[in-house]
Every structure is written in C-alpha cells, then in structure tokens.
Amino acid sequence: MSDSKMSSQDESKLEKAISQDSSSENHSINEYHGFDAHTSENIQNLARTFTHDSFKDDSSAGLLKYLTHMSEVPGVNPYEHEEINNDQLNPDSENFNAKFWVKNLRKLFESDPEYYKPSKLGIGYRNLRAYGVANDSDYQPTVTNALWKLATEGFRHFQKDDDSRYFDILKSMDAIMRPGELTVVLGRPGAGCSTLLKTIAVNTYGFHIGKESQITYDGLSPHDIERHYRGDVIYSAETDVHFPHLSVGDTLEFAARLRTPQNRGEGIDRETYAKHMASVYMATYGLSHTRNTNVGNDFVRGVSGGERKRVSIAEASLSGANIQCWDNATRGLDSATALEFIRALKTSAVILDTTPLIAIYQCSQDAYDLFDKVVVLYEGYQIFFGKATKAKEYFEKMGWKCPQRQTTADFLTSLTNPAEREPLPGYEDKVPRTAQEFETYWKNSPEYAELTKEIDEYFVECERSNTRETYRESHVAKQSNNTRPASPYTVSFFMQVRYGVARNFLRMKGDPSIPIFSVFGQLVMGLILSSVFYNLSQTTGSFYYRGAAMFFAVLFNAFSSLLEIMSLFEARPIVEKHKKYALYRPSADALASIISELPVKLAMSMSFNFVFYFMVNFRRNPGRFFFYWLMCIWCTFVMSHLFRSIGAVSTSISGAMTPATVLLLAMVIYTGFVIPTPSMLGWSRWINYINPVGYVFESLMVNEFHGREFQCAQYVPSGPGYENISRSNQVCTAVGSVPGNEMVSGTNYLAGAYQYYNSHKWRNLGITIGFAVFFLAIYIALTEFNKGAMQKGEIVLFLKGSLKKHKRKTAASNKGDIEAGPVAGKLDYQDEAEAVNNEKFTEKGSTGSVDFPENREIFFWRDLTYQVKIKKEDRVILDHVDGWVKPGQITALMGASGAGKTTLLNCLSERVTTGIITDGERLVNGHALDSSFQRSIGYVQQQDVHLPTSTVREALQFSAYLRQSNKISKKEKDDYVDYVIDLLEMTDYADALVGVAGEGLNVEQRKRLTIGVELVAKPKLLLFLDEPTSGLDSQTAWSICKLMRKLADHGQAILCTIHQPSALIMAEFDRLLFLQKGGRTAYFGELGENCQTMINYFEKYGADPCPKEANPAEWMLQVVGAAPGSHAKQDYFEVWRNSSEYQAVREEINRMEAELSKLPRDNDPEALLKYAAPLWKQYLLVSWRTIVQDWRSPGYIYSKIFLVVSAALFNGFSFFKAKNNMQGLQNQMFSVFMFFIPFNTLVQQMLPYFVKQRDVYEVREAPSRTFSWFAFIAGQITSEIPYQVAVGTIAFFCWYYPLGLYNNATPTDSVNPRGVLMWMLVTAFYVYTATMGQLCMSFSELADNAANLATLLFTMCLNFCGVLAGPDVLPGFWIFMYRCNPFTYLVQAMLSTGLANTFVKCAEREYVSVKPPNGESCSTYLDPYIKFAGGYFETRNDGSCAFCQMSSTNTFLKSVNSLYSERWRNFGIFIAFIAINIILTVIFYWLARVPKGNREKKNKK
C-alpha cells in the first residue's frame, strides 16, 4: 500500500469487514458483549492492513471519505431519531448501531460544512524537553530537620540561575501525530510516559518545558490550546474520579450539556441533544443498563470497577476532544477488555479524525497491531518514534533478539531494562547499552532523518496554512450566545452555573441522607441547647443567661458551615478534571454549589432557630423573631463564604482546618459576650471591628433587650433584717438599674454592659450582608485562579543520614559516566545474564552464609466448599476444590473474574471473615491446621499495604522481629533481613522510605517489599501470592515471576493467582489450578514444557487445537468460556470430575494423607503459639513504630504545635493579665472555657494517622499473626501520649503566663504548687483529647464519622460543663449530663487552681450605689448584709455607699461550683475519665473490629 492510496485488494478487504461488522453489531441495549469473534478477526486483519503503512493527512482524509460512503447512510440529524424512524440511529433501541450512527454523523457534517464546521487537530514537536525543580532522591523531613529543609528549599527557590536545581524529565525528542493516527507510548515506570502525555495535553503545572522546544498543533501554539481550546486537547489520568452519589446517566448528561454546540442543527434543543449524546455513548460503551445506577467509589456502592472505567472513558469522549492523551487507561483491566477499549480508540481515529495517544502496560499483540505509531522512551530519552510495524525491525537491525512468543510491545519495553534485553550473537559489543547511547543511535539512524524531514515539512505547512483562523471559526460556531470567542468553554457562565445547580440537586437526590440528617441534626441540637436555657424568666436574673443563649445561637449558626471545608476537598479533584476538559469554570461551580445549598441552609436554619428561639423564651413577637432569623441566616452565609475561601486557598484539609480553628477562636472571643466591648484591650479592639459575628451578636442583643423592662431579681441590701426597707434605700444589682426603681431597662443594660445601641441594629444587617458579598467574591476569585495541587515527579525518599550514603554510593558507581544506568561500564552481557538469573545465592557476611528456611511439609486440601449469604440466599463460591502445594513448585491459580481465586486463597490461609466453609479438609502433612498455621505461611496480598514512614529495612526488620521465633537472636534476624534484601535486589533502596505515590517507592519496588515482608518471617510452610503482577508493566511482571522462580528453586512452596499471563510468564509455573465460575475446578495438574501437558488435556477432551503462535493461557480461557465473548462447548467441571486425571489427583491426596501423617511432628510448645513474640515485645515494637511515624510526619506535629501555640497565645493575650474585678473573673473563666476550642481540630488531625496504622494492621499484620490486637490498640494509645504531653506543655506556657493566673497564687505563696497542678491539668486535657479521638475511631470505619461523633460529644461536654449554665439553672433532666461530664471536673479544677484565695477589687462601673436611710452610716447599714452575702463597700463623699458584690475570688468560685479544696479530687476524676476512654477504646475495638470465632461449619454427611 502506498502512502496516498489503498489498493483495490485492501478496499475490498475493508468493504467486506465493515459490511460484516455492520450486520453483526445490532446488540441489546441492556448488555455489552463486545465484538463477536468473527468481527474481532475482521478488525484485527483490517488493523494489520491499516498499520502496515502510516497514512498521511491526504490518505487519511481519503480513507474517511471512503468509510463514510461505503455504506448507505441517510446523513440525517440523528437527534431527531423519533421522527426519522430509524432504529439504528436510536440509542434507546435494541437495534442501535454505533458505527452506523458515527458514519451518519460524518455524512451530516459533510452535507453542510459551512454550518457544522467540523475540525481536526494533529501535533508535531521538535527538541521537546521537559524539566523539573527537584531531584530523583531526597530526604524525608522529620520534626528536627523539617524547618531547616523548608528554609533551604526556600533559599534555593530564589537562585534562579542555579542549574543544579533542575533535572531533565524528558530529553530532547521529536515526533508528529496526524489526525486519524493511533499512537502508543511505551516505557517502563519512570521513563517519562506520563510527562510526555501531560506535555502534549498542555497539563504542565509542576514541571517546565524547555525554551528550545517547538510544539505546534497544526499551527496552534500550546498557549493557544491552554487559553482558548483547552477542551480540544485533554489528558485522561488512570484514576476514575466521579461524584459517587450521581448516577451514570446524570454524570454523562451533565458533561454532554456543557459541550452541547450551538450549531447542533435547527429545531434541536439543548436538552434533547445532551440526552441523546449521553445515550449514544452509554450504548456504545455498554453502560445503558447502568443509567440509573450510582457511579460509586471504593466506599460507596455503585457500578463495578470496569464499568466505572467506562464511565470515565465516556465522559472524556463526550468532551469532543480532537487530541486525547490516555495515561495507562487499561491498568487493572484484563487483556480482552483492554483490547476492546483500544479498538474503540481506533474506530474514533479512523472515522472521526481524532488523534488518540495511549500509554499502556502489558500490551497484547492483537492490541499492538491496532496502533499506527509507537513512541519508545528510556529514562526520559526517546529511542524510537515511527510506524508501529517498523519498530521491531528497527531494533532487530540494531542487534537485539526478540524471544519467541514475546509480544512486540513487551520486546520494545524490555529493551529499556538491561536485565532483560538480549543481543543477537555477535552483537554483544556493538549494541548500545545506556539510554544516551540508544538515543545517539536513534538520532544517527535513517529513520530519524526521515522523521525530521517530515517534521520540517509539517512545520512549514502549518505556517502556510490558515488552520488558526479555520479552527477559531469552528470553535466559535460551537459556542453558545454570551460566550466570549476567546473562551475555551462551549456554554456561557450563566449556563454553567445553571447546569451546576441542577447537578448538585441530583447529588442530593442520590444521597438524601446528608441534607436530611443535617436538618434533623439541627433540630435535635436546637432542642438540646435550648433546653439548657429553657423558658428564661422575665427578670434581671436572666440577663446573663439570655446573653449566653444568644451568644450560643450566634456561634451555632456561624460555625455550622465549618465542615463545608471537607466537602470542598471531596469535590476538588472532579472540578479540576472538568476544568481541564473545559466543561465549566471553577468559579461557576463555586457559585452553583452556594446556590444549590440555599434550600438546605434555610431548612437547617429554621429547624434550629425556630425551636431555640421560642424554647429559650426570647421576645415573642413575629417581627422580632423574623429579624432574629434574618440575622442568623446572613451570619451563616458570611461564615460559609469565609470558610470556603480558606478551603479554596488551602492544599489540604489539615492545612485548612488549622487557620479555620484559630479564626474561629478569634471570632468567639471577640464577639462581644466573652469579652464585652468596654473590656476589650486596646491593642485588640480592631478584631471586633472586622468580626462579622460581633455585628450579628450586637443586633440580636438589641433586638432582644431594646425597649423592654425587666423586673429586678436581686436587691442590695436584701434578706433578713431588710424586709421593711424602702426601695429608695435599695438598688438592683443589674447593670443599668436606677436606685429606687423595681424595673430595669433593657436599653440601659445594653448601653452599660456592652455599649450596644438600637441605632446599630439595621446598620449591622447591612454590614453583615456586605461581609457576605465580600467573602463570596473572594471565594469565587480564589476558586477560579487557584491552580490546585502541583504535580510531582517520582522521588525516592531517604532519611537524611542515609541519603548522603546513597549519593556517595551512586556517585562512586557512576563515576565517569553521568548517564550510566544500572549496568554501567563494560559489563559483558553473558555475565549480566548470569548475574540476573543466578539462583544459587548466598549472603556473605560476618557469620558466613545465611540459608533459606528448609520446607519439607506439604499442604493439601480436599473437597473445599465455601458459601456466603447474599440477599438471604446461600450462594456457593467454592465447590469441592481439591489440590496441593509442594515445596519447590509454583502453582498458578487462574480463572475468570469472580471465579473465586482470591476466595480460595483466603479459605486456604484461614483469612475469610464472612461466609462459611461448609465442607472439605485442609491438611499439613496429613494433620489438621493448628493455631500456628497463619504465622507459618506468607501471604502476599494484591494491595501493597505498608506504613509510608517506615524504611524498607525497618519494615522487614519489624516483620522479622515479631514473626520469627523468639529464640532467634536479634543479630541473626538482622542478618536474615540483609539476606532477603539482596535476594530481592533491594540493596539500592534498602534505606529508602516506603512513602506514597510519587514520593517513595515505585510500583515494582513496593511489590518486592510486600514479598520481602513475608519472606523475612521465614514461612516454614508455603507462600501465597494474590495477583502479584496486577497493574505492573510487562517487564516488572516478568521480574516478579523470575523472583518467584528463584524462591521456588530455594525450596519454597508457592501458590499464586494470576490473570491472563503471557506465554513467557506462564512458562515459569509448574502446575495450574483453574477455576470456572462458581468456584468449580476445570483443571488441576502439571503445565509441562510450553504448557503442553495442559494443552494436551483440553485437546484430549474436545477442545479445538491450540495454534502454535497462540498464548496457551489465552487459548485456555477461550476454551473454557472465561474470555469475553467466548462460550465453552461443554461443562469442563463435569469433564474434570469424570476424567482419569481427577481420579489420579484424588488418589495422590489419599496417598499423601496416609503416608505423611505417619511422619513425626514438631512437639516444640513454642511452635504452636499463636504469636511468635511475647506480648510485651509486641507492645514495645508497635509503640516505637507509631512514635517514629509521628516523628517522621512533621506536617502533623508542626500543624499540631502551630494550632496549640497560636490558640493559646491568642487566648492568653486576649485576656492579658486579667484583673480580679467582676468582669475580669468572668474573663478568666471564659479564657479557661476557650482553652478547649482546639479539641475538634486536634482530633481531626490525629485520626488519619490512626487509620493508616489500623489499615496496615487489619489488612496485613493481623491475618499474618504479626502481633495481637491488644498490642496494636495499646501501642496506639500510649504512643500518642508523649506528643500530647509535649504540646500540652507548650500550650501551658503560652496561655498560663500571659493570662496571669500565677498572680492569684502570690498572696498565699503557692505559685509553684498551683502552677504544677495547672500544668498537669492542661497536659491531661491534651491526653484526654487523644484518647477521646481514639475511642470514637475504635469502632468507626471512616475517620469522618469518628470526627463527627467526637464533635458531637465535645459540644455536649462544653454545653453542660457549668460555664454557660450551672446546675442551679439546668433543667432536672440534664443534671446527669453535668455530673457525668469530664469537662465539669476539669473546669472546676482549673478555675479553683487558677483563681482561688485572692482578693477582688471591683472596677468603678461595677459598683452599685446604695443610699442608706437617714442617720445610718454605710457600715451599720450594710454590715449585716455583707456577713451573709459577701462583698465590700466604700463610702462616697456624698454619703452614698459604693457596694461591690465580691471581696474574694472564692465567692466567684462558689457561684460556679468550683471549690479549691476539691481541686485534687477533680483532677483525679478527670484522670479517671481518661482511663475510662482507654478501657472503652480497648473494649469497643475488640467488639467492633476483631474477628471472633471461625468460619468453618461442616455440613453433616
């Protein structure tokens, strides 16, 4: 075939394939079967024809034209399918034909190109270079060096000209991808595949593109793409991020609405178009049956993982992008499903002129044959780009050998791994070795010269063409009215907001529990809080409580939206993805979220405020109530917008919650109640001016008190002996009272106590609305311009000391060659192969060689049957499975998805937590499993679950110390760890931290560590591996299989599940156990050389012969009907049960049981223990590991320190050196009360780290019997105490001394003892915070639920601790809450320790003036009253008596039920509450999280 035309023979092939395909594609809307076998064969042959030569632009256009007209299509507007009456165009019909629909659409576009203005886009680049500001290795910051690292990085940031700061991610490379071409990007993890795709998609935040790089998109620059056509060039990450409670149909319709073009055809409204497009893609990708099913995620039930991946694909397709960059989109998919996806991309490229690029792992040959172009990357170097059919020939010509049955993609990728590539005989010294040498060879090749010529012509062509103007016209034609032509978005801002509001209402509909619970929760809290102040009297005795109730109402309304920060971070990844797809502006989503939450906010506000207002007995007047509610709802709006702004500017939840908590504290203190306006210190008065909550509180207090008269509740003097005194000689104690008057004006009270005035009432409403609008504008601006989280390259983290050693070692090994790879210098390839494949490994050390544990025991099972109850129906998952695993053998466990492979592993290893084993036996040398079985095996799980803050060596040592026999010395265990490190080839990163994705070990290194953790335990019986190659590239999968072979050759027995392995990988296994659906055995036996024994078995019982070039594993899946679209000719379970091979298996099991049971058993009592290490050792190691985790998490520790320091200092200096007058005593009491405010944030900071430890323990360490549950929970509790004591000590000094409480101990010379006791109380509070968080988390699955529960308990504790309302005011029903409240005793102890035994001196405005009767002095008149009521007086010049109600702080303490004599008792009670928390944590964890009993219940035979 030439570059410009197809031969007539090719045309006939194409026409025949398409016609056959069209006739076979009418499929059901409810189920997606993929292509049938006949169609698959046609497309594969067609793909080989198409990819034999790459089409240039003109030939591609000719092909498209041919495809358009080769079948009779009407070329009508498909969105009118009801009027057209053509089922092939109706996605809701069973006869819908996706290809027919696409061809019809293409013909429609061609019928009126001036109206539809179709567009296409290619890309070409030369000298493309990407670089980052980081290193490939770094050190993990700890508490001691984090600040130094931050400072040095900040210093380096300003060194603009320091080239040492930069490193190349992609070296200079060139390529061209034209419309209609499908390109695959191949390379090992870290080669730069993702960076290349992100660069093409102009998704470069986090790294930089070199100035010398030239990139053009058919004449458009990357700046043009990013600013104006962002949605036409997209990057699709491998993760599936969606709103879990939104249905599939709603998710896709939302994307379709936002990309609905203006030129969609006359008479077609937007809703019709969007629904039709969503239905088309749901039908195309087999999602129609999931239209009304929630998408879900790992925690929310929804569609399956494969369907969720298809939802992501459909959503990206609906964006209508011309260039699509798919990053590892097939990860986790089996080869058949991946092939279906690539076929869909091929169809899109050929028919619709799109330009897809995909980075793919484990690419089958059928999939590779569909690609037009291939890019091969090696450590950031491009070592080949060109036609996919020419790549293999290019490298073979270079001198490399492609092993038999190795796919082309695997061969190309293997060339970037020195341990796997193999030169042809005679080429050992001729082939390039390093990545740089490969690139040099490539750039000197004729293929590269031809490429550069083509690229040069392409750039010249782009300069001459009018693509820029044409593409702009196409883009503008799609845009709706009121949309800027330069905008990358298709619809206007108003429409984006409207669609966003509709989507948010659908989210609420999908999960109505959240708004319902919120409204109900507000109602319940309204009932609880109002009952504390129930039915306040209309006297001056209610003044304080009315103020307290109003204060609490304002705070509750203000801070009810604090948790909106959490929802922001939940939605942020989705919003960022949609921004890159150019669906909507983030600011439009921000505004939509606020509008959509208005009904819920109004309902929540009314449910709380209506109940609270009338139960407290506030002013019962409709106008007063609605003003109260109006101020409260605007207060909610203000704080909602403020908290959202904090969340928008923060990069993490913890980073947002800490400043939010400090801000909350400031607003609480400076509202005007805790510190009345006249009492605020001069330096801090401005805080009240900018505090929106203060304006709300003033207006509500004016609304409640202005114009009202209150009956005086207490007179001075009064009581015995004063019954007949005239009112003119008494005065009311309330502020604002007038001597001789029984009523006190509320207006006067506000003016005297708070300096609040009625003239401010409506003014404050305007100020509050102004704050709301201001913070709304700030929030919208921040969401629009905040770039989000920066992308990070892969970095290996070491401890600081280890990093220096690592760099010295690397420098020494690479001396003289900065580009040297893992095998540098003149290493002979024969020596290299021997080094890699050497399986007689010994560790040379001071103690000589370390031997691998010898295993002579055989594990076998018979008639294993397992069932679970699903919807009240017992379902059999495993059906009478037999088998064995012998030392030195690797047994593969295979089967279709859902066949029960992992379930069988869990049953064999006694790890099932649900369901029942109803029949069968599991035997070791003929004996039943004992209590030590689980620690006698190794189980390598599919998930690589490790603690991020541990190094590789520490993780291995931890496992060795706790799982090897306690008789073995520590030195021997350490030597064995070193042995395993070398065995697994982990020496280079043995001291690296596990880290997280991007900053830590890569996928392969994590998998090796997972295997190592099990090996260092010296499993004496066998090793289970569950999908060890899942998600890995083919080279890594191969290295893992070679590792298993090495272990088996050392005598290890291995049982490994594997999903559709390649022929090379399959050859590493000795035996196969294959399960059909329902857990029924289809085959168990030897594989033989090249799997010939297995092939002979199936051919013997009627299977079609296996082609020589076929992968035996894939052939077997087709035979038994386990591959997509395949159907078995017979039930191979019945074939197996009736076969002679099955009878031989049963006889061998019976023989082993009879003979092995006679062998002597190990009678060592220690060998039968459930855990190898004693409990005290488990506890110490677990506690130390947790302490180290926190130490290496400086972000956690410093955020905790920043929170307590800022909160304590702010608190202390707000009440700086509080005086001992009446207001000063109240201020000191509220300072103690405010000291507890950081509780919630401290709990929220701590819980994620608890969850990390718990996940590692429950997923891996508990089932393997590494240590007991009691050691885990005890270690978690005690390891947190040192940090809590440390931050408590810091908080004590930052709060106690600025507040000046030590001055109160001076008169009694008890500064030191009272200071020590206060320190003990403060640190006890912080310890209590940790234990309360752990208690809430002990039985909770999610940290969010535990945090919400802790918040509820904390709120209840604050309400009933006696500060806002004492026991004499509380309704009788709530007295028990006062008595059972730990904060009651803590507050009493802190107040009595801080305030007792000193004098009170009233401020001038706190005196009340009493005029004694004629002829009496102040002394004779007031002394009787002072004897029983307390206080003191001063005689004024005019003869009146200035009376102060208190003379001693003990009087104040008595009024709040705090006695100095009970301080130690109260401290002891509070410590008892801590102990109760600890005990309940242990009990609840055991009840809720520890598996109890066994899952075995044999049926009676």
Curated annotation (Swiss-Prot):
Topology with respect to the bilayer: Multi-pass membrane protein
Keyword Thylakoid: no
Annotated binding of ATP, by residue: G895, A896, S897, G898, A899, G900, K901, T902
InterPro entries cross-referenced by the UniProt entry: AAA+_ATPase, ABC2_TM, ABC_trans_N, ABC_transporter-like_ATP-bd, ABC_transporter-like_CS, ABCG_PDR_1, ABCG_PDR_2, Drug-R_PDR/CDR
Top-level taxon of the source organism: Eukaryota
PROSITE patterns: ABC_TRANSPORTER_1, ABC_TRANSPORTER_2
Keywords: Antibiotic resistance, ATP-binding, Cycloheximide resistance, Glycoprotein, Membrane, Nucleotide-binding, Repeat, Transmembrane, Transmembrane helix, Transport
UniProt-annotated glycosylation sites, renumbered to this chain: N535, N724
Membrane-spanning intervals of the chain: 514-534, 549-569, 598-618, 623-643, 655-675, 765-785, 1196-1216, 1230-1250, 1281-1301, 1315-1335, 1356-1376, 1467-1487
SUPFAM superfamilies the record matches: P-loop containing nucleoside triphosphate hydrolases (SSF52540)
Disordered: region residues: 1-30
Coiled coil, from the record: none
Basic and acidic residues bias (residue ranges): 8-18
Cytoplasmic side, ranges: 1-513, 786-1195
GO biological process: response to antibiotic; response to cycloheximide; xenobiotic detoxification by transmembrane export across the plasma membrane
Primary localization class, coarse: membrane
Domain ABC transporter residue range list: 150-404, 859-1103
Subcellular location: Membrane
Any one cellular-component term (Gene Ontology): membrane
GO terms of molecular function: ABC-type transporter activity; ATP binding; ATP hydrolysis activity
Family label: Belongs to the ABC transporter superfamily. ABCG family. PDR (TC 3.A.1.205) subfamily.
Task performed by this protein: Transporter, whose physiological function is not yet established. Confers resistance to the chemical cycloheximide.
Name this polypeptide is given: Multidrug resistance protein CDR1
